[in-house]
Amino acid sequence: ADDINPKEECFFEDDYYEFE
């Protein structure tokens, strides 16, 4: 999770993308 939707500051995982 690096270049994803940084809409939240909780995407420091490998499978933590909250974008649908």
Curated annotation (Swiss-Prot):
Domain of life assignment: Eukaryota
Post-translational modification: N-glycosylated.
Annotated GO CC locations: extracellular region
The keyword Nucleotide-binding is annotated on this UniProt entry: no
EC number: 1.4.3.2
Keyword set, alphabetical order: Antibiotic, Antimicrobial, Apoptosis, Cytolysis, Disulfide bond, FAD, Flavoprotein, Glycoprotein, Hemolysis, Hemostasis impairing toxin, Oxidoreductase, Secreted, Toxin
GO MF assignments: L-phenylalaine oxidase activity; toxin activity
Biological processes, Gene Ontology terms: apoptotic process; defense response to bacterium; killing of cells of another organism
Location in or out of the cell: Secreted
Cofactors demanded by this protein: FAD
Tissues expressing the protein: Expressed by the venom gland.
First-level EC class: oxidoreductase
Catalytic activity field: an L-alpha-amino acid + O2 + H2O = a 2-oxocarboxylate + H2O2 + NH4(+); L-leucine + O2 + H2O = 4-methyl-2-oxopentanoate + H2O2 + NH4(+); L-phenylalanine + O2 + H2O = 3-phenylpyruvate + H2O2 + NH4(+); L-tryptophan + O2 + H2O = indole-3-pyruvate + H2O2 + NH4(+)
Family statement: Belongs to the flavin monoamine oxidase family. FIG1 subfamily.
Role this protein plays: Catalyzes an oxidative deamination of predominantly hydrophobic and aromatic L-amino acids, thus producing hydrogen peroxide that may contribute to the diverse toxic effects of this enzyme. Is active on L-Met, L-Ile, L-Leu, L-Phe, L-Trp, and L-Tyr. Exhibits diverse biological activities, such as hemorrhage, hemolysis, edema, apoptosis of vascular endothelial cells or tumor cell lines, antibacterial and antiparasitic activities, as well as regulation of platelet aggregation. Its effect on platelets is controversial, since it either induces aggregation or inhibits agonist-induced aggregation.
Subunit structure: Monomer. This is in contrast with most of its orthologs, that are non-covalently linked homodimers.
The name this protein goes by in its record: L-amino-acid oxidase L1
Organism for this UniProt entry: Daboia russelii
